[in-house]
Each structure stands twice: as structure tokens, then as C-alpha cells.
A protein has these predicted regions:
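Active-site-adjacent mobile loop/cap segments within catalytic or ligand-binding domains
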Residues: 141-225
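Catalytic-core regions of hydrolytic enzymes
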Residues: 2-135, 141-155, 162, 172, ...
Length: 225
């Protein structure tokens, strides 16, 4: 006799942190009549709802409040989380910049990735400016987490661009303050450019955001297979 209830409970042994970027007095990027903090929260809530079917899910914020970057990682570590996913939107001075990209924590970063991280880190300068040397990062642990994070980032980006036909900007390693304090594999998803009307019209309906959350969740489920 197969005990379906037991298998369901076993699946829930994994804990996932869903982090909606920005919030409160920090609007994040703005454009197309939208604020990053609002869209990120909506997508994060939909992602959490999807993942709760199979996993323990904790949101770093579930309303329009500001949570410091260091606190976000702390929430995950205190819960012994198995995965940390941060939802964001990108922005550019040129409205033609478009597409999706996913980041993972890396001590080394390209000039482009460093620029994106600099913007996201600017909301909490005190924590963001703490030098990397102050973080006790075991090299083996770091490499394993980095490899798992990069694989997850690649799968999720593929899911998003294949479903929505957005430009595939790539997967990058960068020194994101919200990721570097996490003890688990962790990624930051830039779902699109808030400054690009095409990207934002792609995510303009409730159903499209539900689908976006589903594509991200699909990558998560593959990660835990």
C-alpha cells in the first residue's frame, strides 16, 4: 500500500526562502508606471503560493515593508533554509534595454554584474559595504553552493525565456549583499526591465505573473529532484 500522505510530508522537508526585493520606503527601480517593489512582491507571493504545495516556504516580506539586506539572509539561515530566491526587476537609462537574467553569489564578478549588484546593494549601504573578508566563507562550501546556484539559475532563466520569448541576457556571478550572507544555494532573478514597456507588458496581467511564478517553481522542483 502506497502512503501518499507520507510522501507529501517528506517532500516538505525542504525549506525555501522567497525574497521580494525592496519594499517600504525603498521603491527599487521605477518605470512604465510601475515600481519594482510592487511587482516583485506580487510575483514573490505567487511563487510562494505555488511552492507551498510541496515545500516549507518563508517570505522575507509579505507586505510593503522594508527589510534590511542582512536581515533577509538571516531569516533564511535561522530557518536552516535549503534555498534562497530573491525576485527583482532591472532598470536602465535606455528604455530599449530588455530581457531577463539571473545572478548567484560570486566573489569574482564581471564589470556588468558588479554594476547591477551595486544598484541592488545601495539600499542598505551599511551592510553592503562590509568587506567580503569579514564573512567566514568555507571554500569547499562556497564552491558547492556556487555550483548548485549557477545550475538553478540557468534552469530558471531557460524556463522564463522559453515561455515568454524574452531576451536571454544570461547567468552571472556577482557580489550581491542579499546573497552572500546566505548559507544555502541562493539566486537573484531579474525578471525583466521595469524601464522597458515590452518586458512590462509581458508581465502585465495577473495570469502572466502566475505563469512566471510557475516557471520559476519548475526550476526549483528540478533542483530538488
Amino acid at each position: 500500500k502506497v502512503n501518499f500522505k507520507k510522501s507529501k510530508v517528506q517532500k516538505k522537508k525542504y525549506t525555501i526562502i522567497v525574497d521580494a526585493g525592496h519594499g517600504g520606503n525603498d521603491s527599487g527601480a521605477t518605470g512604465s508606471g510601475l515600481r519594482e517593489k510592487d511587482v516583485a512582491l506580487d510575483v514573490a507571493q505567487k511563487l510562494a503560493s505555488n511552492l507551498k504545495q510541496d515545500y516549507n516556504v518563508i517570505m522575507t516580506r509579505s507586505d510593503d515593508t522594508f527589510v534590511p539586506l542582512g536581515k533577509r539572509a538571516e531569516i533564511g539561515n535561522d530557518a536552516n533554509a535549503d534555498l534562497f530566491i530573491s525576485i527583482h526587476l532591472n532598470a536602465a537609462s535606455s528604455t530599449s534595454a530588455n530581457g531577463s537574467e539571473v545572478f548567484y553569489f560570486s566573489k569574482k564578478e564581471s564589470a556588468y554584474a558588479a554594476e547591477v549588484a551595486k544598484f541592488e546593494n545601495s539600499v542598505d549601504k551599511g551592510y553592503a559595504d562590509v568587506p567580503l573578508s569579514d564573512f567566514i566563507i568555507n571554500d569547499i562550501f562556497y564552491r558547492v553552493n556556487q555550483q548548485k546556484s549557477a545550475m538553478l539559475a540557468t534552469d530558471i532563466l531557460d524556463n522564463i525565456v522559453n515561455e515568454f520569448g524574452l531576451r536571454k541576457r544570461g547567468v552571472f556571478g556577482a557580489n550581491f549583499a542579499v546573497l552572500r550572507g546566505s548559507n544555502s544555494p541562493s539566486i537573484l532573478v531579474e525578471i525583466g526591465f521595469v524601464t522597458n514597456s515590452g518586458d512590462m507588458s509581458t508581465y502585465g496581467t495577473d495570469s502572466s505573473r502566475v505563469k512566471l511564478a510557475s516557471e520559476i517553481a519548475q526550476g526549483v522542483r528540478k533542483h530538488f529532484e
